[in-house]
Amino acid sequence: MIYKVFYQEKADEVPVREKTDSLYIEGVSERDVRTKLKEKKFNIEFITPVDGAFLEYEQQSENFKVLEL
């Protein structure tokens, strides 16, 4: 399953909405995704599964790239 992860680059700073980035990553569960991203030192705000019509919509974006770890 593909997950969309909303995160801040620096885990040691207070989260600011305007600095939130997102990425797409494949995993079997939210826990699996968190484990894969642990070494990145991101401040993960939210992880949501992407499938069905939502996935089709996201794939239309030029920024849609699934992170390979």
UniProtKB/Swiss-Prot annotation:
Disulfide bridge partners, by residue number: none
Induction data: Part of the rpoY-rnjA operon, transcribed constitutively.
One MF annotation (Gene Ontology) recorded for this entry: DNA binding
UniProt keyword annotations, A-Z: Cytoplasm, DNA-directed RNA polymerase, Nucleotidyltransferase, Transcription, Transferase
Reaction catalysis annotation: RNA(n) + a ribonucleoside 5'-triphosphate = RNA(n+1) + diphosphate
Pfam families: RpoY
Phenotype of gene-disrupted mutants: No visible phenotype; growth, bacterial fitness in competition experiments, RNAP distribution, global transcript levels and transcription initiation in vitro are all unaffected.
Domain of life: Bacteria
UniProt-annotated location(s): Cytoplasm, Nucleoid
GO biological process per UniProt: DNA-templated transcription
One annotated Gene Ontology cellular component of this protein: cytoplasm
EC number from the UniProt entry: 2.7.7.6
UniProt enzyme class: transferase
Function recorded in the entry: A non-essential component of RNA polymerase (RNAP). Has a similar structure to bacteriophage T7 protein Gp2 (AC P03704), which is known to bind to RNAP in the DNA binding-cleft. Unlike Gp2 however, this protein does not inhibit transcription initiation. In vitro reconstitution experiments show this subunit is dispensible.
Quaternary context: Monomer. RNAP is composed of a core of 2 alpha, a beta and a beta' subunit. The core is associated with a delta subunit, and at least one of epsilon or omega. When a sigma factor is associated with the core the holoenzyme is formed, which can initiate transcription.
Database matches in NCBIfam families: PRK13667.1 (NF010188)
Family stated for the protein in its record: Belongs to the RNA polymerase subunit epsilon family.
Protein name listed in UniProt: DNA-directed RNA polymerase subunit epsilon
Lineage, highest ranks first: Bacteria, Bacillati, Bacillota, Bacilli, Bacillales
